[in-house]
């Protein structure tokens, strides 16, 4: 409750700052600054036929499904919340060097120590001038355009999905683009601690260098193709003075290929096929839903009995967004993540997750959306034969708002 009160106070402070900024915006004139205020209020209600970690009651994450029978109690739960609701401000300010672009964006979905809470959470705090950008925003290693038109919050588990602190250089901008960035190492999308699988007492993970990421997107008439990559260095130190030497290091790497293919329809919006395939080692914290980056390997050496190994991971995403008309749409698809566990990992360690959904959404008027969605997820353990399924039906209603102050 204390953390929730702190989060609410922080949110109130940001609201005060927002209104002060709005009061300072000058009347509309040529070349004047501009603020775009936007967001939405969103209600989620649904029924979960199985069970999962109660801290993640309103999302479908295969890693949070039970690792053994009735780990989280009995099956069947009703859930509801407004945690997807969002508030953001984008600023545009002319300077002698070009236009400064900034984004501050928050939502109410608590993660990390606030997992399960309705509390303010920072999504973006990012600024850009010319070909350089800095702050917290989408990692160049990910492609946000792969995310389907769905109402389940967490999204496809096999997708690379991470808003990270970074400094980026963008030599090519526009529909065809190129980005190179150095990123904060060791963080994760759900703000949990970095997990190396070497949590023995006295063994501490260290990141001597930032992660290096890059993307190149080539646009064409029907969409685009994007290739992204990442390199990272992970080290762990043995801080206990004994007969064992548990120090080590590993290089992590990954390649992510993604695409959107647009299909003309009679509706105002085009249908879209969204595809992604990623493979790498030691990059699990960049995935939308995956466990440890480093696994334990038993060596048989009396001095170094265990070592670390960057775990290979494969992620796939395939979704189709279809517009029946200007007022009705459907999204359906499948995603999976496959981890190759190390020999020293427990039999009930997470090895593979599946995710699928189908929905029918209705847009009665501009800025209003409502609809229902069926969701399915599955967890498969490493070596004990255990699988756990989850089935959900969710209804959501979303009300957008936006307003521009200043500008021409």
Predicted regions located by residue number:
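Bacterial N-terminal signal peptides
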Residues: 13-23
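Detector for outer-membrane/organellar transmembrane beta-barrel domains
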Residues: 222-350, 407-408
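Outer-membrane beta-barrel "beta-signal"
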Residues: 388-408
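Bacterial N-terminal signal peptides that target proteins for export
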Residues: 2-15
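Sequence/structural signature of outer-membrane beta-barrel proteins
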Residues: 48, 94, 109-113, 139-154, ...
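Sec/Tat signal peptide C-region and signal peptidase I cleavage site
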Residues: 25-30
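Outer membrane beta-barrel
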Residues: 31-57, 63-64, 68-189, 206-224, ...
């Amino acid at each position: 409750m204390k953390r929730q009160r702190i989060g609410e106070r922080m949110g109130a402070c940001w609201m005060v700052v927002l209104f002060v900024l709005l009061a300072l915006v000058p009347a509309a004139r040529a070349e004047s600054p501009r603020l775009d205020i936007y967001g939405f209020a969103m209600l989620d209600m649904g029924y979960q036929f199985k069970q999962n970690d109660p801290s993640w009651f309103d999302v479908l994450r295969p890693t949070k499904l039970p690792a053994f029978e009735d780990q989280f109690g009995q099956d069947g739960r009703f859930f509801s919340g407004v945690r997807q609701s969002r508030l953001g401000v984008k600023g545009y300010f002319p300077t002698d060097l070009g236009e400064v672009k900034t984004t501050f964006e928050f939502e109410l979905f608590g993660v990390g120590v606030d997992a399960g809470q309705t509390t303010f959470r920072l999504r973006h705090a990012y600024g850009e001038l010319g070909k350089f950008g800095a702050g917290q925003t989408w990692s160049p290693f990910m492609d946000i355009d792969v995310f389907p038109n769905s109402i389940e919050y967490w999204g496809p588990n096999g997708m690379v999905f991470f808003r990270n602190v970074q400094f980026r250089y963008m030599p090519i901008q526009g529909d065809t683009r190129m980005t190179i960035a150095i990123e904060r190492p060791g963080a994760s999308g759900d703000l949990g601690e970095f997990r190396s699988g070497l949590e023995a007492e006295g063994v501490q993970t260290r990141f001597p260098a930032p992660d290096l990421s890059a993307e190149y997107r080539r646009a064409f008439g029907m969409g685009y193709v994007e290739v992204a990559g990442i390199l990272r260095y992970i080290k762990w130190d043995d801080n206990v003075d004994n007969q064992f030497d548990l120090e080590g290091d590993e290089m992590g790497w990954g390649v992510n290929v993604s695409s959107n293919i647009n299909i003309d329809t009679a509706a105002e919006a085009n249908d879209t096929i969204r595809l992604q395939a990623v493979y790498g080692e030691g990059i699990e914290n960049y995935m939308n839903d995956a466990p440890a980056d480093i696994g334990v390997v038993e060596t048989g050496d009396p001095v170094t009995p265990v070592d670390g190994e960057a775990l290979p991971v494969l992620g796939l995403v395939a979704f189709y967004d279809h517009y029946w008309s200007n007022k009705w749409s459907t999204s359906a698809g499948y995603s999976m993540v496959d981890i190759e566990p190390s020999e020293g990992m427990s039999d009930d360690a997470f090895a593979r997750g599946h995710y699928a959904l189908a929905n029918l959404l209705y847009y009665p008027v501009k800025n209003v959306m409502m609809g229902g969605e069926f969701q399915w997820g599955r967890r498969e353990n490493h070596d004990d034969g255990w699988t756990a399924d989850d089935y959900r039906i969710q209804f959501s209603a979303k009300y957008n708002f936006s307003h521009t102050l200043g500008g021409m």
